[in-house]
Amino acid sequence: MTAILPVRFTAMKWYGKGPLETYPDRQCGGRMGVYSEDVRNQPFYLRPQEYGLHTESRSMRLTDPDRADFVRFEAACPMAMSAVPYSDLQLWNARHPFELPAPEALYVHLDYAHRGLGNSSCGPDVLPTYRIDDRPCRFGFALEAGLGEREDNPFGPIPEEIPAYHPWKAVEEQDGTPSYRDPSDPDQRSNAGMV
């Protein structure tokens, strides 16, 4: 899923693998944690191409540092997320960095699955483990937006820390229907027999 935001949302904070980009077949050097960076300062390639992905991400917040407006994405399951100031088409069409247009928007990518990079430019293709089958999938995420800490902000101040990710556990109810429980909630753990 791709969302397009105003280019002014340059401050990125995420909970996932980092601090540098990670891809499904190139993530051993990444460590889970909360990281921050300016999307304009992400490492870039000499030949424009996709960049800036963070695998195993649970949450990402993009903020306008001048106005403190923010947009936050919270994944229902670990996903691959990125935020870059160029569209895929702009990166594809440019052979050199000077051919890229001045950034006019921020492109946020939320990927349930992402194909590995491989090395097909000078070697073998992606290993079968890192390929993606052409099949339907379902994923979910929550979107939160706020106006920052100005007097006219009806949402209140921006939280300083991203809350910890708590995976939900699928359980089967007594009548056989599937349900989900939040393992961080003691009452739900007890009711689901997860204690």
PLM features: what roles do these ranges have?
Residues 1-195:
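Beta-strand/loop-rich accessory regions of lumenal/periplasmic or secreted enzymes
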